[in-house]
Design a protein with these regions (language model features):
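Positively charged, proline/Ser/Thr-rich regional signature most characteristic
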Residues: 1, 74-144
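Thiolate-centered catalytic microenvironments shared by cysteine-dependent enzyme domains
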Residues: 1-75, 95-96, 138-145, 150
Length: 150
């Protein structure tokens, strides 16, 4: 099992978890609350190098986890597909370009900044499944639609 964690509200750990799943490593998890919560709760930590274990990993792509550009272009305006923009408010509004040559969003996308999915506590732990369902449903993100996040 791979347990991913970070000190950024699980933003990068979640991205890494997704990458592992995309390459077929389905035995992975994100540590809720990350390194800071682990440390603050007095859980064991070490500065020793872990002992390397020889393993063989054979990637097996999960193509259903990505949306190709051509597929995205043909899905714009399709009521069966919803684009969910989880970037920052500034990226959504186009006031922050993060180095891109253009700013803005995919037409008709729904915006829910990723911070809406974590609690406003010092560890940014994940909200409960019911809270997440309520947030998503209120934004029109429902199970019968194909959801494309970015």
């Amino acid at each position: 099992t791979v347990v991913a964690y970070d000190s950024s509200g699980s933003l990068w750990a979640s991205r890494f978890w997704w990458v592992l799943n995309y390459y077929g490593h389905n035995n992975s998890k994100v540590l809720d609350g990350g390194w800071k919560k682990w440390f603050d709760e007095g859980r064991p930590v070490s500065i020793d190098r872990p002992v390397k274990k020889e393993v063989t990993f054979t990637p097996k792509l999960e193509p259903g986890l990505v949306c190709l550009i051509d597929d995205a272009m043909s899905a714009i305006g399709n009521d069966e597909t919803l684009f969910l923009d989880v970037r920052s408010d500034g990226e959504w509004s186009g006031t922050v370009d993060r180095g891109n040559s253009r700013s803005g969003r995919i037409p008709d996308a729904v915006h829910l900044e990723w911070l809406n999915f974590v609690k406003n506590d010092k560890h940014h732990t994940f909200k409960s499944p019911q809270e997440l369902r309520d947030i998503l449903e209120a934004a029109g993100v429902t199970p019968e639609k194909e959801i494309v996040t970015y």
